[in-house]
Structures are given as C-alpha cells and as structure tokens.
Amino acid sequence: MNVIDTDDLEKHTPMMRQYLTMKAEHHDMLLFYRMGDFYELFYDDAKRASELLGISLTARGKSGGDPIPMAGLPYHAVEGYLAKLVQIGQSVAICEQIGDPATSKGPVERKVVRIVTPGTLTDEALLQERQDNLLAAVYQGKIGFGYATLDVSSGRFVIAELDTRESLEAELQRTNPVEILYSEDFGELGLLNGFKGKRRRPEWEFDYDTSIKLLLAQFGTKDLHGFGIADARLSLQAAGCLMQYVKDTQRTALPHINAITRFNQTDSIVLDAATRRNLELTQNLAGGRDNTLAAVLDNTATPMGSRMLQRWIHQPLRDPKHIKARQQAVTELLDTAAHEGLHEQLKALGDIERIMARLALRTARPRDFARLRQALGLLPELQQSLSTLSAPHTTQLRQHLGEFPAEQALLERAIVDNPPMLIRDGGVIREGYNSELDEWRGLSEGASDYLVQLEAREKERTGINTLKVGYNRVHGYYIEVSRLQSSQVPLNYQRRQTLKNMERYITPELKEYEEKVLSSQGKALALEKQLWEQLFDLILPKLHELQAFARAAAELDVLSNFAERAETLGYTCPELSQDIGVQIEAGRHPVVERVSQTPFIANPVTLHNQRRMLIVTGPNMGGKSTYMRQVALITLMAHIGCFVPADCALIGPIDRIFTRIGASDDLASGRSTFMVEMTETANILHNATASSLVLMDEIGRGTSTYDGLSLAWSAAEYLAQQVGAMTLFATHYFELTQLPELMAGVYNVHLDAIEHDDTIAFMHAVQEGAASKSYGLQVAALAGVPNKVIKAAKHKLQQLESRDHQAEGTRTPIQSLLALPEPVENPALTKLSSINPDNLTPKQALDLLYELKRLS
C-alpha cells in the first residue's frame, strides 16, 4: 500500500487516517510513526522493515476492513536501526508525537520532524568517521554533464563541469557518493550501477534560474562571480537540485554551507575510474580498505585528517609550488621531530569539522559542546608548538587555527564536566551559570532531605515501623505501609495504590509538596533547555572562523602524518623536475612491502625524453604488475606532497596516470573481459599525452594469439611514436621485444627467475634486456596442475618450438604497422555511405546511380 487514495481515508480509523496522510507525503521512504515508546511501521513499510532489519512482522487489528501489517522498534534503539538502513541506501522519515496525549481529542498531534537519508547524515552514530559522506547530483546537458557534491556533515560544496561520459565515471569513482540525485531524463543510468542511494528527481529541481536563486539565497550574495563559478551552467543546475533536497530533508537553516568551489581537472593529475580501481588507492578490488595505499599512509590523529588525506590521494597536485610547500612543511616537521608532539595534541581535538556542522544545524549534543570546549582549550598549547616552525605553509596554517578564548570560557562556565548524552533530561548546564536555574534546582534537589524528615516524623507520629516515603514516575510521591499495619494509618491518609503486601497513601501535605517539587523540576528543565538553545546563538557568530580552524587542524594532521610515515617506513623526499620523466632508485611498492612475508626487492625505473617506453617481460608471478603499480604509486605520492618508498626519486610533470592492468567481465553492462580491456585501451590511446604515465599489462590476451599480438604491437607502437607517453608495457608476446630495434625511445627490461630441476625461484629484480623465457609450465606446476598435464604440455611445447624453428627462415621481418600505407578508400563506397535513401526523390535516385557508375 504505497499510493494512498484520499477518497478512501474515511474507511479507516482516525489514527490510521493520520498515518496514511503522512505516508502519502513521504511515499518514497520508510515512515517511522511514533506511538508511545515505539516507532511503528504499517503496510508495505512494515513488510520491508521486517525484511531489512529482521524485526517481527505482526498485524494490528483491522482498518478499512483489512488486517494491517505492522512492525515496531523501541524508540531508544532507533539509531542502530537507522544505521543499518542508511548503509543500504534507504531513507527514513521520522514522525514524532508533538501533542500532549492527556489533552488530545482524537489522535495525538504528530509531525515529521526529521528525514534521514544516506547523503544528509550528520549524527555521529550514523557516520563512518574516517570517510566523507557525500550527497551528489548529476545533470546531463546536450553536451557534457554537470556534477555537484555536498558533504552536509562538513559543509564542503564542490561542482565540476565534465565534458565526457568517461570524465563523469572518473568523478563518481573519485568522490564515491553515498546518495545520488539524477534528473528524470538522465541518459547514462549505467554509470550509476553499484551505487546504493539513487534518487530520481523531477526536472524542475534542476531548473537553472531556480538553482541560481537558491544558491544566492544560501550564500547571501548578489551573484556567483566571487566563487569563480558563474559560467558553470550545468553543474550549477546540479548544485541547485542538491540545495533543494538538503533544505527539504534538514528543515532548518544551513549556515555551515557558506561557500562553493569548482573542481578543475587541470589543477590535479587526471585519474580515470579504471586507474583508481586498479591502483587500489582507498578501496581494494574486493571493496574493502585493507591493503590499499590509504591504509598504509593513514596514521592520522583525527578523523577529519583521515578524510582529508583520502581526498588528497584522489587529487594529486600538478602545481609544483603547492607540492613543494607541503614537502617543506613535512621536512621541517621531520627534522625538528615536531610531528611527535603534534600527533598527540591533534588527537585530543577530535572531529571538530563535523561537530561544527551539527552546531550549525542545531543538532549538536551536550558532548559535542564538551569536545569543542576541550579543543578550544588546547589551542594555545598547539599554537605554542607551531611557533617554533618557520615553513611558510605551516605558518599560514597556524594563522588559520585562530584563537577563541571567549568561546572557550563560555563553554567552561556553561557545560558540566561530563555532560549526559542528551539535553532531554537536563543536567547539562553547570551550577553557577544561571542564578534562576540554580534556584529552581535547589527546590527540586532539596526533596530528598524533606522526604527523610517526613518519613521519620510520620513513623514517630503513627507508631508504624514499616512506614516508608518514596517516589516513582507514574504515581509520584507516596507513603508506603505494610498491609498488616494499614489499619493503623491516620484519617488524613488517602489510599493511592494497593500492592500485594503493601498499601500506598498520599496526604494533603505530601501532595502539596509534590506539586511544588514537580513544578520546580519542570521549570528547571524548561529553563535549562532555553539556556541550551542560547548557547547555539552565542557560538554560531564564530562559525566561519571555527570551520577554518577545523580545516587547518586537519591539514596539519595530514602533514604531521606524512612526517611520521616517512620516519617509520623509511621514505625519502622526492625531487621535482621541470623535465618530463620518472627516475626512481630502489623503489618499493608501498603496500606490498608492508604485507609481504619476505624482504621486498627494491627496483629502479628510468623514463625520460630519450627513454619513453619500457617493454616489461618475465614470468607470471615474477612481479611485473607489482613493479608497474609501484612506479605509478610512487609518482602519485610525490604529487600529494608525501615522501616516497625509494632511495631517491626525480619526478617530472605529469598530467594523467593511466592503467590497463587486469580485467574481468562487466556483467552489468554486458561487456566481456576482452571488451573491457579494449575499452580501457581505447581510452588511453585517445587521451594520453607526452606528459602522461601509462601502465599497460598483457594487452590482447583475451582473443586469439595473432589478433592479440597485432593489437598489442599496434598499441605499443602508437604510444611510442604518436603519443610519446611515458609507458611501462608488460607483455608475454616476446615478439614485442623487437620494438627497441625498430624505434627510438623503446627499451626492454625484464624480471628474471632461476630454474632448478622442476622448481623455479622468482628473483623479482628488474634487469635491462628481454626475458629469455616465460616459465609458464613451471608456474602451472606451482599452481598444482597435475603432473600428467604438465608432461603433456612440455611435449606439445617442444613440437611447437620445433615447428617455429623450421619456419624461422621463411618469416618476413616485422616492420612498423603504423608505417604501412593507409588503405585506399573506394570513392563510390564513400559516396554511398553518406546517402540516406529514404530522403531521395526518384529523380535524385536515378542521378545518384549515374554518379556511382562514374565513380566506380
């Protein structure tokens, strides 16, 4: 029951009419409907929640003549259930009781007060603390795409204008949003496969004029020129949809979203989706985080530092000035050992970035304020530690940290040392902060002394030794007497409750005191909540400066982390060159060296203008893929300002890194392994430049031997002669080792192995020249292929090698395929291919026949 016919509402009970009306307004999400101490779900929502959460599916009587499927969950456990739902991309509308059941006529007044979606989370319990939580929107124009991302938990708002489908795919891979909004006519839904929280939105939400008005209102500006985005039409339409969606779900002001930036691909090294996946930067091929570059590099002290590090990894810089600024900061931290003390100081700051977002949304909890107080109190010490450092970038970050003595003093006066989780029951505001609150609390807290005195006095007056004075939330204050002595109670005792062995009474005096105490408790709680709300008003004027403090602290954390990683893992500072090239001495794979059970064999690489392509040969399991990946990872690490696992490295300017390593079927798109391989190869051949780093592994293996060899040869030749990209080209086609004889700038290197009897030892050391053999049969034996099959394979190999040897003298020398003449096109066929016969008149068709005759 998803679509509600309002004409049928009269058939239902008043409560179900209220529910169905609210459900109609939130038909595309689960509705948690508060009833007492439970959230209830009905109809299809109940069935879906039962399936997703493993809760019992029951029925609640009948309404409209039919049994009502129902599922419920306790309100105090709701956060755990919400976490499960948002993790699988499900959105939830939370409907609370806002009326008083005691005074309500008919159903208690209820209202949807909160909408929880995967991309709009700010609650600490629902977020992955070391991952950005991005909401994205994509809009397709006649040419290109507009893409926007917003992290509601930090306020970071970024847009990008993307020319091609491949660029959009790369951005989706880079940002990895948890929720994606797309327009009704979006034509590339295949790109969204694998993303959980997909939301189809009406076209009007992407309207350009509406989007501009929304953004101007949000930022409080007359135009968008100051952000440098005024001409980004498509991405502004996507940003407008995001803004509308966040306003609809958050239902409050969003002051922490106060700026928008444009992501320019020219500012960072371009990494396409295949490259990010193949290099396992922040996610391994199985979808986890283990054994990734981020897992090795991330020893940050704060969650916000960890998130920034991952953004840096996915956006390696191209500007050498910015890279060197980071390097200088890391070098100074390392040389002075300042990173050691900084790590502990930064760790105590916590996740200020997300705390500030919750404060801006007025959803911060008492412990958020306590953590902010602690962080602000640590600032003077942090500033003092940084005062001895002189690297320009560190000095700039120190200035952005700021100082907030007034705000720290305010929170010190206002919030108790160890506040409760929620403001709901009070106990958050410190004694002495407000005299009126202290007075009301005094009345309430004096109750225990009064009750002790009353109990002693009544025992003495009545002579009843079992008499006790107590309190519970349901019945309030009472005098309790055993049933055996209940006949001795005075006449002014009024029976309040009968238990199995006890009677409970109230007296006029106790009733009067109860009303006074409960009144004081209520007034104290109401005043405390009022003072709590005022704290937001007192802190929010410093929101922008506090956000700048959080960003600066996060960056200091990353730089300090780089220094610690360099010291711990033996990394060195790479040198940046203005000349194109990658030269690494004794380079190591940053991930493999950490997980390998044996000592890692370091290897060099030399690529420059006169040595642009290396044909890499060697046995399977010999380390070719590891070698190529380590070159790419070291290059990337150098461009984020990190030190690298090598004795030394000289890295020139890079515009793109491409990888064609490994492949599997793309079942969702109906593409075979070979089709995936060729698609990635085509992307490289179309987009690589002389400043690109290209890794090509086993091109052509998914088809016949001669087809594969021809494709591999042509691709290598094209990259070497037409593109001139710095290329590592691994292959088992030994014919390709002849390329260095035919063209300049191409060299052979190989990884060797030593064979002894029927065993093989991989050396993992890169040497100049081509490999002598592939050792395929030996590797097959290591894999456990039966001996009978191995022996048969050896016999067949001898036959094939003998046949090849006999044919050796008749072979035509291999020549450059690109040097062959272009095939001559038939003019008649060219003319015919350009004709649409449906558009021809009889006379035009006859004339065309004569022309084709002439051309042929």
Curated annotation (Swiss-Prot):
Keyword DNA-binding assigned: yes
Disulphide bond pairs: none
Protein's GO biological process: mismatch repair
Coiled-coil intervals, chain numbering: none
Binding site for ATP: G618, P619, N620, M621, G622, G623, K624, S625
GO MF annotation terms: ATP binding; ATP-dependent DNA damage sensor activity; damaged DNA binding; mismatched DNA binding
Keywords per UniProt: ATP-binding, DNA damage, DNA repair, DNA-binding, Nucleotide-binding
Pfam families per the UniProt record, alphabetical: MutS_I (PF01624), MutS_II (PF05188), MutS_III (PF05192), MutS_IV (PF05190), MutS_V (PF00488)
GO cellular component, one term: cytosol
Function in brief: This protein is involved in the repair of mismatches in DNA. It is possible that it carries out the mismatch recognition step. This protein has a weak ATPase activity.
Family: Belongs to the DNA mismatch repair MutS family.
Protein name: DNA mismatch repair protein MutS
Annotated gene: mutS
